[in-house]
């Protein structure tokens, strides 16, 4: 018996030595694996601001309420009712969440911190919290189509939020903690690995100009009972987009009833036949060739022109017009006669060089190339109609970029949504400086009383631009629904801004671009020039405006 007792004692000592010394590290690791946990520490998503630092998107701290279902089911009835009430859900909904056999379940995401504190004070079994963030958009529907929004998991789903997801995201940190068997944190063990917050994205957008464009476009869409609309403001020196608005829009802070029509960034995604806003490009090609001058006379009588079996007509018959007057009075016949003086290749290359048929490459979702037919399939009638904006499709952003070539003395350049401290890249020359300036003079004529858009004039400033009025196509056929547009630039002597406006399906009488889109351009351009501190350059209009204020 003594020997047996001594043997047992020796075995116990040996086992203890093995456990305490030889296998200590292994056992300690197994033990720690049961109560040590690495917890991810969320990084804050980067802010999005306008060019002046005003907030467009910011992350606010919130809480996720989660549960270990098996433990949470031990809550009393009153505890469950209290938790459900704090989370603004029914007791039945809460019961269904914790009825699962899973070991983890989200009870509710993005709970306000003050609510989470009240829940924590209840010390409910199996109910836990983690920090997360919720995206907030201070400017709401005004900037929704540019900024976009994130989902509940803080990932970008639209706009800049999606396009710059990796830069905005940041990197989470971590900390090692001790939890009890119920999942409660007892203490921190390892020092915090700090999270790296996402980068701030500063847009080229100017919130004041954005608000101006939004309010004026909204008023016009409501006045004309239109289906939709869009407006863009571009700084021609840098290619920066100072404003981009669409209607209808939506509130990114409350997307419960968001529809596809509200979500569409129409200025980038919607294409349409532009109509007469294309005519200045045809005139520029003719001037650039040296075949005509602004004062060259074109016979537009009797206001009709037959090509094959098709007849092209002017809205109002004209007789003899100079090239400048063809643009000013928006003659289809005169424009077609200019266009048919060139082989299809030359006209196609010009349209391609100013960006038609190409995506604008802003880096945001939804950009389209629109439609510029391959030159190999151009017939005379196709070339004729494209010269005045039919048989070709464009987006509003393409028109804004294309008109920048006249503002930049014949050079085209890229557009950008992001503010850059670097000098803008050199442009690509499309037209000579002389041609660009001659077209600007014609565009200024178009807003005079004898032109098609006197309502687009801006008191105190010399401006120029072109109207567009085009039928819409539905089911492969033209219907009596209109797209009214106006694209212009100012100050005309040294343009700083291009403003493009489109109103989709105006009703109630007026539908011409000069009547519907022209006044919107006037308000947006005038307000933008004043916001940027650009001095008036038309003393005659300044005097007229001052005299008008003194009348009874």
For each feature predicted by the language model, list its residue ranges:
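Periplasmic/cell-envelope proteins involved in peptidoglycan metabolism and beta-lactam response
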Residues: 1-255, 345-357, 473-477, 502-552
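Beta-lactam-recognizing serine transpeptidase/beta-lactamase-like catalytic domain environment
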Residues: 57, 179-192, 231, 235-276, ...
